[in-house]
Amino acid sequence: MNNNDLFQASRRRFLAQLGGLTVAGMLGTSLLTPRRATAAQAATEAVISKEGILTGSHWGAIRATVKDGRFVAAKPFELDKYPSKMIAGLPDHVHNAARIRYPMVRVDWLRKRHLSDTSQRGDNRFVRVSWDEALDMFYEELERVQKTHGPSALLTASGWQSTGMFHNASGMLAKAIALHGNSVGTGGDYSTGAAQVILPRVVGSMEVYEQQTSWPLVLQNSKTIVLWGSDLLKNQQANWWCPDHDVYEYYEQLKAKVAAGEIEVISIDPVVTSTHEYLGREHVKHIAVNPQTDVPLQLALAHTLYSENLYDKNFLANYCVGFEQFLPYLLGEKDGQPKDAAWAEKLTGIDAETIRGLARQMAANRTQIIAGWCVQRMQHGEQWAWMIVVLAAMLGQIGLPGGGFGFGWHYNGAGTPGRKGVILSGFSGSTSIPPVHDNSDYKGYSSTIPIARFIDAILEPGKVINWNGKSVKLPPLKMCIFAGTNPFHRHQQINRIIEGWRKLETVIAIDNQWTSTCRFADIVLPATTQFERNDLDQYGNHSNRGIIAMKQVVPPQFEARNDFDIFRELCRRFNREEAFTEGLDEMGWLKRIWQEGVQQGKGRGVHLPAFNDFWNNKEYVEFDHPQMFVRHQAFREDPDLEPLGTPSGLIEIYSKTIADMNYDDCQGHPMWFEKIERSHGGPGSQKYPLHLQSVHPDFRLHSQLCESETLRQQYTVAGKEPVFISPKDASARGIRHGDVVRVFNVRGQVLAGAVVSDRYAPGVARIHEGAWYDPDKGGEPGALCKYGNPNVLTIDIGTSQLAQATSAHTTLVEIEKYNGTVEQVTAFNGPVEMVAQCEYVPASQVKS
């Protein structure tokens, strides 16, 4: 009997014994850490040592050092002048206690399959199985769900995954599942959900992910730069493709111009951001607006521009429609309340004369409005994005270098001049091959739903909601498959997620780290990291600086497999392997992608070397000829020949399309709507007075790299995720810097480490999103999160009936010093493995 047979026999014996064991008897005291490496792995580690291996990541390109088979150091790529501090944590991404090592199945699901006790999800008890077993169960569940329920019961989702044009989990998941059968699709995302729906209605394009005016033109022409909820310095560390970080050179130039008095920067934000601090507090005008009152401030600015005759009538007449319909609301002719500076002062906390002075300054010279994404991640977030456009239109500088508005300046190196080059293709999730189960009968349910409402679908199947002019009937989801994403990080109100999770029959997670999504899954499949495979990636995003080889740094760890191989093997089980792979392996795909780039380059006058020469010798190609660009310039120069993608072809200050939807929470023009909860005297603030921000983190990308102990040592407080709080709020609560505190509201509670900082206005607190969920009571709703995931506290409601996006920043909390027993954080340890599965059992001990 070989080791695998012993393994299977041991598992069968173990399952037979499950019924007679107590919990104490079943669980081992150790966490899932390897007792010894396999012989093959040990041999590999003994011989492999190498320096200077080139590869890429979301945090930048690196030269990796391998010693004794382990990835031990990451040095910045020599062309990256401004490397992110986060690359120090990349070796931990491969080697850490939270690494998924083997295929695992939740104990009770292994016993009862889809009839399991779903309340046990999250208790972290898993059984190790073989790859064949795991994939068989994966396939069998797909078959069962398609035959029993049909496509309306299955949802798949991906997210930020890893870099690489070929190894993208989202495309591979989509293609594999599409070859088997239809499923429920999703629209929107968690980053820009409100803005990406409203802006196409207003200016004809999504705006949020597009290139911005070139920084050299901004630095040359702008006199005033308004940072509205945008932290450039912090957020440009990580990009979708491998970043070159060239944009930081322009931040240095901006800092010099600000110090010299050539450009004035205004930061509209409740906190002193990293960008604000970098440019110098003494140089930046800070408008510390009360959270969630940005729209009243915008309306007051617009009112001042109009009442003081500072607005551009010609631009409104020739490039916009609907100002006349908006004006009665602005002036108070509809409701008797002019939206002037005196009115806004009571809501925003900004005195009326400061508001008027800001409007005058913006109108006096060339003004570039740089809008972030955090403000639209709140209830009625569409209104703020719409008003950004209205303000820019009233200023009349849209389409001029250094003027107008932009929503993507903090992302993907925006504003770095783009180079004439090639954009590689990748592994597509689409296929022309019909699925095995070609069933398009969704039984009256919608086939696509807004992603931020998928928990609603689980909890309230059949509920009808509005979404961007359509009626959506939420499908009765029974099975979810996640690859390259972590919904327990990105979705709001975790205790509500847990309630929904209990209604699902099967959850499958494919990842390389034991995130909370994996802990709450039934089948967990170990994927490789980008450092364990070969790939290609763009170097630079909007800059399109070049193409980089992503060389394998170390072999796949433990039993991890590439997503490509996982889904290839899954497809083999229903006779679609060839359709999935298209007859190519990893290197075959890289050569195809490269050759497609060669052909693309010929049409652009760009030469790429032969693949083998690139891969074996060059490893990097750099493109030339950076091109200057002005956002919306073509539209400004000729709106007839270059119309916007709106019904009128113009900027729609009033949208008849939206008005005709008859939504009470998003009407035909931008408006101020009170929030369901709001700090500084707003609804709910008497009981929970602090506004909680959950913005992008400084030391990770969402939840990626939270597993890095190297990085956590730089930012955690008392072993917890930090909560930032003002000195005034801390003093009032008897909280000192370094204290463990409890942050809580009606939705949940977390522990965090207090950081008392004067960068935060009174009434404002912050916990960065992406902190791993670590409940003290397994999968029980209402458990105390021992580490500090802010989505325990956030609210799961749509922004409005238009976008149905996340409202994460509509969140109030209270904070108190924690005097209870501080339990050890266990989020980063992996699951508790059943004793019988820790090692193979000798044949003499196996009973038939």
UniProtKB/Swiss-Prot annotation:
GO terms for cellular component: outer membrane-bounded periplasmic space. Keywords: Metal-binding, Molybdenum, Oxidoreductase, Periplasm, Signal. Pfam families: Molybdopterin, Molybdopterin_N, Molydop_binding. Reduces trimethylamine-N-oxide (TMAO) into trimethylamine; an anaerobic reaction coupled to energy-yielding reactions. The keyword Oxidoreductase applies. InterPro entries: Asp_de-COase-like_dom_sf (IPR009010), BisC (IPR006658), CT_DMSOR/BSOR/TMAOR (IPR041954), Molybdopterin_N (IPR041460), MoPterin_dinucl-bd_dom (IPR006657), Mopterin_OxRdtase (IPR006656), Mopterin_OxRdtase_prok_CS (IPR006655), Prok_Mopterin_Oxidored (IPR050612). It catalyses: trimethylamine + 2 Fe(III)-[cytochrome c] + H2O = trimethylamine N-oxide + 2 Fe(II)-[cytochrome c] + 3 H(+). Residues 1-39 form the signal peptide. Binds 1 molybdenum-bis(molybdopterin guanine dinucleotide) (Mo-bis-MGD) cofactor per subunit. This is Trimethylamine-N-oxide reductase 1. It comes from the Bacteria. One of its GO terms (biological process) is anaerobic respiration. Its main location: periplasm. Its EC number is 1.7.2.3. It is found in: Periplasm. Mo-bis(molybdopterin guanine dinucleotide) binds at S191. Predicted to be exported by the Tat system. The position of the signal peptide cleavage has not been experimentally proven. One of its GO terms (molecular function) is trimethylamine-N-oxide reductase (cytochrome c) activity. It comes from Escherichia coli O6:H1 (strain CFT073 / ATCC 700928 / UPEC). PROSITE patterns: MOLYBDOPTERIN_PROK_2 (PS00490), MOLYBDOPTERIN_PROK_3 (PS00932), TAT (PS51318).
